[in-house]
Swiss-Prot record:
GO terms for molecular function: ATP binding; ATP hydrolysis activity; ATP-dependent DNA damage sensor activity; damaged DNA binding; single-stranded DNA binding. Belongs to the RecA family. This is Protein RecA. ATP binds at residues 65-72. Keywords: ATP-binding, Cytoplasm, DNA damage, DNA recombination, DNA repair, DNA-binding, Nucleotide-binding, SOS response. GO terms for cellular component: cytosol. Gene3D superfamilies: P-loop containing nucleotide triphosphate hydrolases. Pfam families: RecA, RecA_C. Can catalyze the hydrolysis of ATP in the presence of single-stranded DNA, the ATP-dependent uptake of single-stranded DNA by duplex DNA, and the ATP-dependent hybridization of homologous single-stranded DNAs. It interacts with LexA causing its activation and leading to its autocatalytic cleavage. Its main location: cytoplasm. It comes from the Bacteria. It is found in: Cytoplasm. The gene is recA. One of its GO terms (biological process) is DNA recombination.
Amino acid sequence: MDQNKQKALAAALGQIEKQFGKGSIMRLGDSKTMDIEAISTGSLSLDVALGIGGLPCGRIVEIYGPESSGKTTLTLQVIAEAQKKGKTCAFVDAEHALDPIYAAKLGVNVDDLLISQPDTGEQALEICDMLVRSNAVDVIIVDSVAALTPKAEIEGEMGDSHVGLQARLMSQALRKLTANIKNANCLCIFINQIRMKIGVMFGSPETTTGGNALKFYASVRLDIRRIGAIKEGDEVVGNETRVKVVKNKVAPPFKQAEFQIFYGAGISKEGELVDLGVKHKLIDKAGAWYSYNGEKIGQGKANVMKLFAENKAMAGEVEARLRELLLSGAVPVDDKAAPVEAEEFDAESEQEFE
């Protein structure tokens, strides 16, 4: 670049910084925030699938799936992990269905958790925006997008048509929220539900509620599904769960993770440590016996899980070694999920009015 251009650029950059504040424009190489801070999901395999060790701070995340698939459980685990780091968390409960006893069982400090149960969608998103702009809240959960009912719909009659109202509300709110979330380095998670599009002949008929805006603004989108039941005898005690990283702007997408969720206890970390330890040869398996560092640690997966639950030091050591191995880029991350088919935009069934 010649000298005149350099002088002109320096003058322009100086003027921009003077008018809009320091840091309003910078060279990417000068930025000290190249590494994205992440908050663990409570699942080691999902942290690995996300590529950065968890969900990214300063970004919007969408978690969606069918009913009883583990969406709220996963977000409560994120809150528990964030609170362990001393972070402040808020839960905007638009569904009015949060169970504090269950949250406490998952490790959430319910005494310190901020909770709001708003009356309307506008109120919920306004509260969310005020919390973000305070720069004092690190994690915000909105449960769920489908329950963010516009004020006009609540005040109207039961059968009234309100086409595109919720989509317009979400689009406007996300335009305001995105920059504030980045500046506050706050993780904002929207839980969403699934609906079926009518008349779809090819591809998946499933779509999420609230228009298309959230799909664009979200840096990470997670599709969570229940793929089986965990039984003790005839009694069902938990779910086998699969999470697909459908969209990821901070690492390669389309990875997937599988883990167990036990009723009343949440994600089984011990089960993940056993499975990943065996897969990556940190734990040796010969027949039904498992060995670690040359010593037998148990017969059968259930006994090893019990040992890890009791011996936190050993479990912590295995987890630390797995994180170092899997998140350094030395080993390929979990299996790839099948790429998600692009959804055709149907102007009639899902309009986003601005």
